[in-house]
């Protein structure tokens, strides 16, 4: 990584977050979905995106695969690259937060320390960690890309759940059994949590 740039100044937005939230009628928040590959993070994030959009809310999905096509296409899957991947996502999510958007991030984000760093970028009530809890067997049966099979065959190195660890959240804001519940139930659980926290109506 290059040295940190100097002689730069943060420019405050001409329209602040509070004004945007007041105009739109809802708060912005980072909803951070974490879990194994195949646990349903992207599926749930996108289904929730549709549900919130239908309510007239401003939302955006940051998906792990999509981000690696552009912003993070220079990163691999070593521990240090995973850390940098999540650091970048945390910063991007913070920008969306300031823009008054409900940002839905769907990343394996296997290490607790990296998720905690992302949380600490914003205020306590601005970050909601949701653990998509599905056991490894279920995740493997959902693997349409064949990634788990390749990992078990040694064709993919540093694959979370097989050759690289996943550190489960110790105290997530919400834990959903995405292995057994259908997508509508999962979406309803998240929306109920958002209502409970007065983030949406």
UniProtKB/Swiss-Prot annotation:
Catalyses which reaction(s): adenosine 5'-phosphosulfate + ATP = 3'-phosphoadenylyl sulfate + ADP + H(+)
Any coiled-coil ranges, and where?
Answer: none
A single GO molecular function term of this UniProt record? adenylylsulfate kinase activity
Q: In which pathway does it act?
A: Sulfur metabolism; hydrogen sulfide biosynthesis; sulfite from sulfate: step 2/3
Q: Which UniProt keywords apply?
A: ATP-binding, Kinase, Nucleotide-binding, Phosphoprotein, Transferase
Kindly list the biological process annotations in GO that this record carries: hydrogen sulfide biosynthetic process; sulfate assimilation
Q: Does the keyword Cytoplasm apply?
A: no
Pfam families, sorted: APS_kinase
Active site as annotated: 109 (phosphoserine intermediate)
InterPro entries per UniProt: APS_kinase (IPR002891), P-loop_NTPase (IPR027417)
**Its biological purpose:** Catalyzes the synthesis of activated sulfate.
Under the heading NCBIfam families, the entry gives: apsK, PRK03846.1
Protein name per its UniProtKB record:
Adenylyl-sulfate kinase
Q: Which gene encodes it?
A: cysC
């Amino acid at each position: 990584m290059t040295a940190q740039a100097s002689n730069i100044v943060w420019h405050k937005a001409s329209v602040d977050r509070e004004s945007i939230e007041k105009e739109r009628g809802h708060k912005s928040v980072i909803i951070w979905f974490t879990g194994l590959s195949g646990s349903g993070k992207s599926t749930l994030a996108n289904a929730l995106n549709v549900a919130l959009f239908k309510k007239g809310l401003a939302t955006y999905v940051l998906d792990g695969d999509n981000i690696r096509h552009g912003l993070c296409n220079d990163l691999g899957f070593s521990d240090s690259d995973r850390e940098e991947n999540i650091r970048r996502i945390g910063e991007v999510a913070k920008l969306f937060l300031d823009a008054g958007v409900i940002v839905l991030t769907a990343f394996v984000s296997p290490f607790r320390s990296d998720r905690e760093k992302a949380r600490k970028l914003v205020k306590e009530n601005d970050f909601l960690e949701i653990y998509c809890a599905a056991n490894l067997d279920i995740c493997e049966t959902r693997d349409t890309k064949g990634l788990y099979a390749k990992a078990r065959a040694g064709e993919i190195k540093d694959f979370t759940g097989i050759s690289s660890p996943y550190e489960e959240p110790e105290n997530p804001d919400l834990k959903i059994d995405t292995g057994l519940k259908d997508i509508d139930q999962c979406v309803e659980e998240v929306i109920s949590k958002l209502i409970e926290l007065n983030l949406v109506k």
